A protein has these predicted regions:
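Long, low-complexity, polar and repeat-rich extracellular regions
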Residues: 1-476
Length: 476
């Protein structure tokens, strides 16, 4: 018989439930030591909490579906025969999280409060063993230390072997320490990239230019060194009586990024990639201590665009001929003609993809990789200076790791879920304000708590430098 848990159940030591049909939890199941549930199917609804101090173990022949909270202060172990679906408001926390399944889906879902993205976050280590893994639409796979993805869990609940596929689609996989991804096919891709052609700021200018008869060069007025009345011009020292005068507008257009939601794979330690087909499509792979490639290299796919120089105006041909009596020369102009030469087109990469670190290939050699930086503000391409500015993303996060405090002025607007932080405080701007004796009452509401503020800073460092840490730093 299918079991629905609609009332709170708490035990000081252990809760063990075994049900062949299945179980749906709509309330609180909490154990002081271990929580063990075994069933064909296990569903933890949005209001459901499965929690234990030492260990949470969920075992399902078919699938586990979670839109609520699954949390332990020790090991969170979930094993299924078919699927683990962590959706929308779904949160899975633990010091050590170990997942064993055939298919893992960590993704977004529409809720009454809008779109929410699921999170699986470990305080010490995250191990995922699956054949097919999909992390989608701002969903998060995270570890505050090590993270490993493979094909099966060993007796110590560590991932080993190889998964068949990992699709990280406009979502994030991150670890503060080392990361090991053993996946036959890894796809890190941007689901929401778009670009369009726009005029380059300050590129428009009016041009007067000349082309001597028989010459292939069109030279602007700065090359005119003298006039011989109205009959001749001197272009770079050459005298021309017959020439074409051009009067046109010159301007530039190029492709700019309109929208982008890159996928992120970010390691604060060494990132080891072990797979046959590795693709980084308009997204970012960053590792502070380098990237180690055990099989095939990563195919970094950038967005392609064009830069065009456009010229549009009129031309008139000037020539000198004899008068009707043949006794003197006269300057003559033909009528105006449209001047619209073919655009000068140059391919242009939009520098969306990032792949940072020196990587060690299968042959043991260490090769530098180019760091590509995103230039988010338009810059006049005619200058030699480099200007890189980043506007941080200050939109409210939809990841379920973060909550929004709309009405409580004593708390930051964005607060990390306390079940994950275990009610610990993270160093943030409030500490700095206290040290400076600044009265927060005279200031605006803080945007986020310390954990979220650190995330914003880390994201800006990555965007500005293409690196996980600033030079000279080895941690957050």
């Amino acid at each position: 018989e299918y079991l629905n848990v609609d009332s709170s159940i708490q035990a000081g030591n252990q809760i063990s439930i075994e049900n062949a049909a299945g179980l749906t939890n709509n309330n609180l199941l909490e154990a002081g030591n271990t929580l063990d549930i075994s069933a064909n199917d296990i569903k933890n609804s949005q209001k459901g909490i499965l929690q234990a101090n030492t260990k949470v173990h969920l075992s399902a022949n078919n699938q586990v579906e979670n839109t609520g909270l699954i949390n332990s202060n020790g090991l969170t172990l979930i094993e299924t025969g078919q699927k683990i679906q962590n959706l929308g408001t779904g949160q899975i926390y633990g010091d050590h999280i170990a997942l064993q399944t055939s298919q893992l889906l960590n993704a977004e879902q529409q809720t009454a409060e809008g779109t929410k993205s699921a999170v699986i976050a470990a305080r010490e280590r995250l191990d995922i063993a699956a054949q097919q893994i999909e992390n989608r639409e701002q969903a998060l796979l995270s570890s505050e230390n090590q993270l490993a993805i493979g094909g099966k869990l060993n007796q110590n609940h560590l991932a080993e072997g190889a998964a068949q596929s990992l699709d990280n689609a406009s979502a994030r996989i991150q670890s503060a320490g080392d990361m090991y991804l053993s996946v036959n096919t890894l796809t890190n891709r941007n689901l929401h990239f778009s670009s369009s052609e726009k005029e380059v700021p300050n590129s428009r200018e009016q041009v007067i230019a000349y082309q001597g008869s028989g010459s292939n060069e069109i030279l602007d007025a700065s090359h005119v060194t003298g006039w011989g009345g109205q009959e001749t011009v001197y272009l770079d020292g050459n005298r021309y009586e017959d020439y074409t005068k051009y009067d046109y507008t010159r301007y530039e257009k190029q492709d700019y990024v309109d929208s982008s939601a890159p996928a992120y794979i970010v390691s604060g330690g060494t990132l080891t990639l072990d797979g046959q087909n590795l693709s980084n499509n308009k997204s970012q792979i960053l590792a502070a201590q380098g990237i180690k490639i055990l099989q095939n290299d990563v195919d970094n796919i950038d967005a392609e665009g064009e830069h065009r120089v456009i010229q549009s105006g009129t031309s008139r041909y000037h020539y000198v001929g004899w008068n009707s009596t043949g006794t003197s020369k006269r300057s003559k102009w033909n009528g105006s003609k449209p001047y619209n030469p073919a655009d000068i087109v140059t391919p242009k990469k939009l520098n969306v993809v990032k792949y940072d670190g020196s990587y060690q290939g299968a042959n043991g050699g260490v090769n530098p990789t180019q760091i590509q930086r995103v230039q988010t503000e338009a810059v006049d391409d005619k200058t030699n200076s480099e200007i890189r500015t980043i506007t941080p993303d200050l939109s409210l996060p939809n990841q379920s790791l973060f909550g929004i405090n709309k009405n409580n002025n004593n708390e930051p607007l964005i607060e990390t879920n306390r079940a994950f932080t275990q009610y610990k405080n993270w160093l943030g701007s409030d500490y700095m304000l206290n040290m400076l004796s600044t009265d927060p009452a005279n200031m605006h509401k803080r945007l986020g708590d310390g954990y979220y503020e650190q995330k914003l800073i880390n994201d800006q460092v990555a965007q500005l430098t293409g690196k996980v840490y600033l030079d000279g730093y080895t941690n957050y």
